Amino acid sequence: MKSIILFVLSLLLILEKQAAVMGQKGGSKGQLPSGSSQFPHGQKGQHYFGQKDQQHTKSKGSFSIQHTYHVDINDHDRTRKSQQYDLNALHKATKSKQHLGGSQQLLNYKQEGRDHDKSKGHFHMIVIHHKGGQAHRGTQNPSQDQGNSPSGKGLSSQYSNTEKRLWVHGLSKEQASASGAQKGRTQGGSQSSYVLQTEELVVNKQQRETKNSHQNKGHYQNAVDVREEHSSKLQTSLHPAHQDRLQHGSKDIFTTQDELLVYNKNQHQTKNLNQDQEHGQKAHKISYQSSRTEERQLNHGEKSVQKDVSKGSISIQTEKKIHGKSQNQVTIHSQDQEHGHKENKMSHQSSSTEERHLNCGEKGIQKGVSKGSISIQTEEQIHGKSQNQVRIPSQAQEYGHKENKISYRSSSTEERRLNSGEKDVQKGVSKGSISIQTEEKIHGKSQNQVTIPSQDQEHGHKENKMSYQSSSTE
């Protein structure tokens, strides 16, 4: 009975303090109601004394209440109070206070009335964030396995007010660790999706050869030869809190996120020769060399729409993070007419560079593609040695010849493919479409060679060759 009376008195003190705060915010900053001061230090002793007597009547169990107050910025008042109570532990109270001027708001007297009725071993933390009239409350009970002793001794409340926030262009992740429990919240982002669904970790050696030949000379043959040699393969399926959703369109929309992480020496060689004229020759050469540079290309929300493409469209979305030495050589050779020749040559060499291509939320729409569109979606994280060879020769017309050759070789690498929940919508494709999303994290030595010759007319010749070689990469 005595404890109930003391608790009621403590609640009355809290109400008086709150009335004082509201009176100060209402415009009477200089004059406060009677019985209350700007900093309620005089009433603090009775308040805590009442709660100590109340807690002393309890035989088992303990609870801890932590108050965090954020008063309006216009009042220049931010006050935090950390109150830790341990029952049957000689009434020890740990209080940390930070006053920056102004008054305090006590908004959780109802929570106190509910927390003291809890049984033994229950531990509650009440955090109130009050900014501009909005209050966010989070109640956690992480440490239920600590207070199982009858006396309730040894209970400690740990609270770390650290928040790690990652804002990646439509992907907002907020990780807050409180009392050893981490909570992830997404705020301020219209698009929130976690892209971790499937993991393949290859530790030792992996050799993959894929051959796919398409011949359309009156008959159709399809031969696929796949060899996989690997050991210590781990597949993990991660189900995120938010599923990937495809919006902003009714059909033919796919979202890609590609990531390529290379940390040491890289050599990229890509050859692409374009011939578009009849007898003309046009050569473009671009050489780029940098040392200890950081390149970030943010391509958030890019939209690529391809309609009625007649000859071979290739869509590649990559995200590269390179921290070591890299060489990129791109040569593009393609022939669309009989005798035209067009050459575009680009060599890229950088030392200790960081390239980061963020292609979050990119949307590619392909409609009415008549001949062969290639779109690649993979995510690779390689820790061992792997060798991948993909050969796709195909013939689409009588005298046409189309060959796609991809040679991939790496050692001491880690391969990670996340292909869960990926959605790929393509409509109206008449001849063979391949969709690939690549995300590569390379920690060892890798060598990639991609050769794509393709021919779409009777005697035309189109060749796309890309060789990728890297050594001592992390």
Curated annotation (Swiss-Prot):
Family the entry assigns: Belongs to the semenogelin family.
Localization per record: Secreted
Signal sequence extent: 1-23
Signal found in the keyword field: yes
Any one of the GO CC terms: extracellular region
Keyword annotations from UniProtKB, A to Z: Repeat, Secreted, Signal
Gene name tied to this protein: SEMG2
InterPro entries: Semenogelin
Subunit structure and binding partners: Interacts with SERPINA5.
Listed Polar residues bias regions: 31-40, 137-158, 174-194, 325-334, 372-397, 445-455
Spans annotated as Disordered: 24-62, 132-158, 173-194, 226-247, 272-474
Protein name (record): Semenogelin-2
